[in-house]
Swiss-Prot record:
Localisation: Cytoplasm
Enzyme kind, highest EC tier: transferase
Protein's job: Functions in the N-end rule pathway of protein degradation where it conjugates Leu from its aminoacyl-tRNA to the N-termini of proteins containing an N-terminal aspartate or glutamate.
Family: Belongs to the R-transferase family. Bpt subfamily.
Gene: bpt
Organism of origin: Leptothrix cholodnii (strain ATCC 51168 / LMG 8142 / SP-6)
Pfam families (UniProt xref): ATE_C, ATE_N
Keywords: Acyltransferase, Cytoplasm, Transferase
Catalytic activity: N-terminal L-glutamyl-[protein] + L-leucyl-tRNA(Leu) = N-terminal L-leucyl-L-glutamyl-[protein] + tRNA(Leu) + H(+); N-terminal L-aspartyl-[protein] + L-leucyl-tRNA(Leu) = N-terminal L-leucyl-L-aspartyl-[protein] + tRNA(Leu) + H(+)
Primary location: cytoplasm
Listed name of the protein: Aspartate/glutamate leucyltransferase
Cytoplasm found in the keyword field: yes
Record InterPro entries: Acyl_CoA_acyltransferase, Asp_Glu_LeuTrfase, N-end_Aminoacyl_Trfase, N-end_Aminoacyl_Trfase_C, N-end_Aminoacyl_Trfase_N
NCBIfam families (UniProt xref): PRK01305.1-1 (NF002341), PRK01305.1-3 (NF002342), PRK01305.2-3 (NF002346)
Domain of life of the source: Bacteria
Length: 247
């Protein structure tokens, strides 16, 4: 794992949190290494942090720092080499009618309602299904880096907007896009999550950026293991990004 002192981040300080219950693996305790102060973490600095395995949650920039556990593995997709599977191509084709709108970070009641539906159906009992407006805003709508909100809708009729299907938060980095969080209409048959990752890959290509950073892959967590289905991909192992063989 890259040490923070090896990064051009001399003004930042890093501290380890106290242990807390792991969100992904039952009966495990987790710790995080946090980069501070947050007001010094601009788009340039954050790009270096993401390349070193950090992620962002609101103003909170962190990476796993767990005792005796290295299950969280940063994963990124080299977008120009991406080769979709048959099921991924099917999901892409299924939702070609969706219309993407790139927006600044802002609170939209319809987005928040979709977020709560998604959490209640996909992650019920995890705590986020009861997030208040303030918690939602702090988690997704606060940023000091180059962030975008993208909403995906069905085609509208006249002046009426179409049905909202997906909302995604992205950070634009020096060398790629970073997928912060995505939520969508919780219909398992629709493969909205797969479609959205493929849209992000296509968007990175369009912007001339080589990578899509998907966050942490956790093999033992169904919520996180899907990321390795996007191939080829690279994982940050021992401080070096390494291309992984096809599974």
């Amino acid at each position: 794992m890259t040490h923070p002192k090896e990064l051009p981040l001399a003004q930042l300080q890093f501290y380890a949190t106290a242990p807390y219950p792991c969100s992904y693996l039952a009966d495990r305790m987790a710790r995080s290494q946090v980069a501070t102060p947050s007001h010094l973490i601009n788009a340039e600095t954050y790009s270096g942090l993401v390349a070193a395995g950090f992620r962002r949650s609101g103003m909170f920039t962190y990476r796993p720092y767990c005792d005796g556990c290295q299950c969280c593995v940063p994963l990124r997709v080299p977008v120009n080499d991406f080769a979709p599977s048959r099921s991924q191509r099917r999901a892409w084709k299924q939702h070609q009618g969706l219309q993407a709108r790139v927006m600044r970070l802002c609170f939209v009641p319809e987005h928040y309602a979709l977020y709560l539906r998604y959490q209640n159906r996909r992650h019920a009992g995890g705590g986020m299904d009861e997030d208040s407006v303030d918690q939602y805003t702090q988690f997704l709508l606060q940023s000091r880096v180059n962030s975008r909100l993208v909403e995906f809708r069905e085609p509208g009729i006249g002046d009426q907007p179409g049905a909202l299907r997906i909302v995604s938060i992205l950070d634009v980095l020096n060398d790629g896009l970073s997928a912060v969080y995505t939520f969508y209409e919780p219909d398992p048959a629709c493969s909205y999550g797969t479609y959205n990752v493929m849209w992000q890959i296509a968007q990175a290509r369009e912007l001339g950026l080589p990578y899509l950073y998907l966050g942490y892959w956790i093999e033992a967590s169904a919520k996180m293991a899907y990321k390795s289905l996007f191939q080829p991909h690279e994982m940050l192992l021992g401080g070096t990004w390494q291309r992984q063989p096809a599974r």
